[in-house]
Amino acid sequence: MSLANQVLAVNDDLPIRTHKPVHSGKVRSVYWLTEEDSARLIKEKGYDVAPDAPLAIMVISDRISAFDCIWHGEGGLKGVPGKGAALNAISNHWFKLFKDNGLADSHILDIPHPFVWIVQKAKPVKIEAICRKYITGSMWRAYANGEREFCGIQLPEGLEKDKALPNLLMTPSTKGILKGIPGVPEADDVNITRQNIVDNYEAFNFSSAEDIAQYEKLLKEGFNVISQALEGIDQIFVDTKFEFGYVHDAAGNEKLIYMDEVGTPDSSRIWDAKEYQAGNIVENSKEGFRQFLLNHFPDPDILLNKERMPEREALARDNDLPVESLMDISRTYIGIAEKITGKPITLSENPKAEIIEILSKEYGLID
C-alpha cells in the first residue's frame, strides 16, 4: 500500500446519511445526522444528552494546513501519514484528563474509529481562546517591532525571544469574520482585547457576561492540566488555542464546554524540555512545518503578509513539497502522540473503507 493511499485527504465524500450539506473545514468535515438517526443513537448508545439533541459525525483528515493554506507533497501525497489519528488520540487523552480533573465536558459523545468522533451540536463561542506561557511566534514578532500592548495587555520591557512570560497570558482573537463590533476589524483571526469581549459579549456568542470569567477559568485550568502532564514527559507547553461552545445536557440545562481539539501539535506549540535547557528549540508541533515553509520559499513575506493571500494560495496550489518534509511532520505528530498517550499510533491501510464499515455495521448510518 503506497503512502498516498494510507492518507485520508478527502473526508467530505463519505456516504453517511445526512439531510444537510457536509461542512468541510481545513482539517475536519462535519456530517449533520437526521433527527431520526440522532434520536435513535441517543437511545441505543445511551448518550447523556437530551433525547432530541442534534448529533453529527466529525471526520478528521490527514491534510496539513499552515498559513491558512492546504499543502501537498510530491507523488500525489495529499497529506501527512498518521496525522489525523495522532491529533484525535491526543485530544481524546486531554479531554479525559480534563474530566478526571473536574473541568468541563467536551462535545464528543463517542469514538467509533481513530478518525471519527460522534459529537453533540454546540453553539460556538466566536473566539479563538489563546493562552501563552512563552513569548514566541506572532507575539514575539510584534514585540520585536516595538509593540508593547498585545490584546490590550501591557508587556514589560526586556522580554527575550522564546523565554517564559512573567505570567500566563490570555490573548484572544476572533473566530471567523465578525461584523459590526465596535473596535474589531472585519477580518478573520484578528487580535481582540478582554474589554472588546465584555462590551460585546452577545456578538461573540456568550449567553451571559458572567460566562466570560468561566471561559477564562476553563482556559487557564485546561492549560495548566496539560502543562503539568507534559512536564512529566519532558515537554514544554508553550502556547495553545482552545475553542468553547454551549450545549444542553439531558435535563435541558445549558453548559459551557470545550470543543474542537485541545493540546494538539496543530493547535499548540510544544517544545522538548531537555533541548530547551540546552539552548535549543525543538518543536513537537506544526511550528516545525511552518518554519520549513518559511525557509523553503525565497520570499517568506508571502506566507506572513495577509495582504498577499492570492500569492500564498497559488504557492500552496502549485508547489509539490518534498515527501521528506511531510514525513518529518508525520514522525513529529506520531512521536508526540505516543509520548502523550502512552499508546502506539497505527497507520490504517485504508481508513475510508474502515470508517464506512464501522458506521454501517455498528451505527446504521450508511445507506
Swiss-Prot record:
UniProt keyword annotations, A-Z: ATP-binding, Ligase, Nucleotide-binding, Purine biosynthesis
Gene3D superfamilies: ATP-grasp fold, B domain (3.30.470.20), Phosphorylase Kinase, domain 1 (3.30.200.20)
Presence of keyword Cell inner membrane: no
Keyword Cytoplasm: no
GO molecular function: ATP binding; phosphoribosylaminoimidazolesuccinocarboxamide synthase activity
Pfam families per UniProt: SAICAR_synt
Enzyme Commission no: 6.3.2.6
InterPro entries xref list: SAICAR_synt/ADE2_N (IPR028923), SAICAR_synthase_Vibrio-typ (IPR014106), SAICAR_synthetase_CS (IPR018236)
Pathway it works in: Purine metabolism; IMP biosynthesis via de novo pathway; 5-amino-1-(5-phospho-D-ribosyl)imidazole-4-carboxamide from 5-amino-1-(5-phospho-D-ribosyl)imidazole-4-carboxylate: step 1/2
GO terms for cellular component: cytoplasm
Catalytic activity: 5-amino-1-(5-phospho-D-ribosyl)imidazole-4-carboxylate + L-aspartate + ATP = (2S)-2-[5-amino-1-(5-phospho-beta-D-ribosyl)imidazole-4-carboxamido]succinate + ADP + phosphate + 2 H(+)
PANTHER family membership: PHOSPHORIBOSYLAMINOIMIDAZOLE-SUCCINOCARBOXAMIDE SYNTHASE
Family from the record: Belongs to the SAICAR synthetase family.
Stated name of the protein: Phosphoribosylaminoimidazole-succinocarboxamide synthase
Species, as recorded: Vibrio parahaemolyticus serotype O3:K6 (strain RIMD 2210633)
